[in-house]
């Protein structure tokens, strides 16, 4: 029973629509009606600006970190990655935002920040290298996911490998419209990096 309650709590934490809340507070807008219509950090940066976008990405990362920490904080015998995955599902399908959320990148990163901090640090570095080279946030996110799988092949943690592989597949699936735009050369590039 405690495990089920913890999973529900992790999902609810993930469901907190950071982009929607920050958009309303910072600019008085619903970011789902602007830019890509997505609740995630990339649309927040594009729609709300760097300061508000930074708050959204920090909040989305924190959701994953907090959810992964719940088993330790509440002394519930469940793997932290499972709790983290529940938060990622909440972020993508948030009960508080009609089940239309972000693309799982920042919240997945937050899970890894708690469970595998070295992986998280290298992921951030790899992401910015890809971003510098490609100027596409979406492509950089997907390539960083593939990097995490390769990293996990060298770490003796089968749970981490399975979860990272599933999360990367999910991130790529959530970016399928971006993939089409990249192929059609209509995906917007960032201009500030």
UniProtKB/Swiss-Prot annotation:
Record's keyword terms, sorted: Cell membrane, Lipid biosynthesis, Lipid metabolism, Membrane, Phospholipid biosynthesis, Phospholipid metabolism, Transferase, Transmembrane, Transmembrane helix
Entry coiled-coil feature ranges: none
A GO term from the CC aspect: plasma membrane
Organism superkingdom: Bacteria
Gene Ontology process terms (BP): phospholipid biosynthetic process
Location of this chain's protein in the cell: Cell membrane
Keyword field contains Kinase: no
Membrane topology per record: Multi-pass membrane protein
Catalytic activity: an acyl phosphate + sn-glycerol 3-phosphate = a 1-acyl-sn-glycero-3-phosphate + phosphate
EC code: 2.3.1.275
Keyword Signal among UniProt keywords: no
TM segment ranges: 2-22, 76-96, 112-132, 152-172
Pathway: Lipid metabolism; phospholipid metabolism
GO molecular function, one term: acyl-phosphate glycerol-3-phosphate acyltransferase activity
Purpose of the protein: Catalyzes the transfer of an acyl group from acyl-phosphate (acyl-PO(4)) to glycerol-3-phosphate (G3P) to form lysophosphatidic acid (LPA). This enzyme utilizes acyl-phosphate as fatty acyl donor, but not acyl-CoA or acyl-ACP.
Subunit structure: Probably interacts with PlsX.
Family: Belongs to the PlsY family.
Protein name: Glycerol-3-phosphate acyltransferase
Organism: Bacillus velezensis (strain DSM 23117 / BGSC 10A6 / LMG 26770 / FZB42)
Gene: plsY
């Amino acid at each position: 029973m405690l495990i089920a309650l913890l999973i529900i709590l992790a999902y609810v934490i993930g469901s907190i629509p950071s982009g929607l809340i920050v958009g309303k507070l910072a600019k008085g807008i619903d970011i789902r009606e602007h830019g890509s219509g997505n609740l995630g950090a990339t649309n927040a940066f594009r729609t709300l600006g760097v300061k508000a976008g930074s708050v959204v990405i920090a909040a989305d990362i924190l959701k994953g970190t907090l959810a992964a920490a719940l088993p330790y904080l509440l002394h519930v015998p469940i793997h932290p990655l499972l709790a983290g995955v529940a938060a990622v599902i909440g972020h993508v399908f948030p009960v508080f935002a009609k089940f239309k959320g972000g693309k799982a990148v920042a919240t997945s990163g937050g899970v890894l920040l708690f469970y595998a901090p070295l992986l998280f640090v290298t992921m951030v570095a790899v992401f910015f290298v890809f971003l510098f080279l490609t100027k596409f946030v979406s492509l950089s996110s997907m390539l960083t996911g593939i990097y995490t799988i390769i990293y996990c092949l060298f770490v003796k943690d089968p749970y981490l490998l399975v979860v990272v592989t599933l999360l990367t597949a999910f991130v790529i699936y959530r970016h399928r419209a971006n993939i089409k735009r990249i192929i059609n050369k209509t995906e917007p590039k960032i201009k500030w990096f």
